[in-house]
Every structure is written in C-alpha cells, then in structure tokens.
Amino acid sequence: RPCLIWMDLRSAPQTEKVVATGDVALRVNSDGRGPVSAEWMVPKALWIKQNEPEIFERAAVVCEYQDYVNYHLTGRWVASITNVSARWHYNRARGGVPETLLEKLGLSDLAAKWPAEVVDLGQVVGGLTARAAEHLALPKGLPVVQGGADAFVGMVGLGVVRPGSLAFITGSSHLQLGISAV
C-alpha cells in the first residue's frame, strides 16, 4: 500500500486512544498528558490495524520514510533515534520500545515489525549496495550516515543547541522548537 506520510492525519481519532492509556511512555514527548499527534507512528499503526487489518498483518516492516530509504541504500533496516524518540514514544533509558503502551492499544505485534536497531544521528548505517551504487552512479560501499527529522537537524544548523534558544521553522509544516534546561 502507499505509505502514510507524516502529514496524513486520518489517524486523529486514534490519538485520543493513545492519550487515554495514560501510559508512562507518553512522558517521552507529551509530558504524560498529550497531545499526541496524528503525524506519529503509534496512531498511524493503530489506524492501519483497525481499518486495514489484512495489510497490518501482512506487513513485515512498519517504518519511517528515512528507514525505508536507508534500507534501499544499504540493505539494512535501522531506525533513527530522532524519529523514534519524537514519534514512537521510544525511550532508550527505559528499555526503548514502549511495550506497555503498545499492549494497552492492542498493538503488541507492532514492535516486531519495527526495525530492531536504532541508530544515532551521524552514525554510519552501512555501505551503499551495488544496486544502489549503480542506480545513483556512486561508488559501491560509500558510507551512508544516519540522518534525522528535518526540523530537528535544522535546529542544529540554526544554532539552537542551548537552553533558552528557540527556532521557528516554516515550510510544509510550521514548528516552534526550543531547548529548555529541564
């Protein structure tokens, strides 16, 4: 099936179900209360499971756009820490995958469909495969480095890296992203 890109908001009703769990995983990016965005992975996956269950069951991998591109470049399924932290309620310090949240939503089977390895920004994902190298006219084995969500990477480029700094980012979306001391 065609992917559900970030701006596809059909999973808005599912966000309410995610918030209603009151799960500790919501503290990662929603302060435990919400809001939860329909742009994020868990509501989208819940929407697919509820509305297209045959597709959810057949899916071997459920991932972000970046994971898909990295797979086609390197042959490795990995996830980006910036995406999983912001959109999957992933908390490395608490064991990573938000298992209790997924259980409460009837999505226990989702974690097995996610890329098992989470790679930090700037780490090498792998080398360019022969097929990708030929298609792109680049050298086979060229290192492919993990990126991140555009707005968060843009914050670094704007110098928003210390508490008290703020970035206003506009384009296909509009964001106000800040750094606090807490």
Language model: regions and residue ranges:
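Gly/Ser/Thr-rich active-site cleft segment
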Residues: R1-C3, L9, A25-G148
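Short alpha-helix plus adjacent loop in nuclease-associated cores
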Residues: L4-T21
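Short helix/loop capping segments that flank catalytic or ligand/cofactor-binding pockets
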Residues: Q14-T15, H72-L73, P98, L128-T129, ...
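A generic structural signal for short hydrophobic patches within well-formed alpha-helices
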Residues: T15-V18, A45, L102, L175
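Hydrophobic alpha-helical membrane-insertion segments
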Residues: K17-V19, P53, R76, V84, ...
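Catalytic phosphate/nucleotide-handling subdomain of diverse soluble enzymes
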Residues: E134, L138, L142-V182
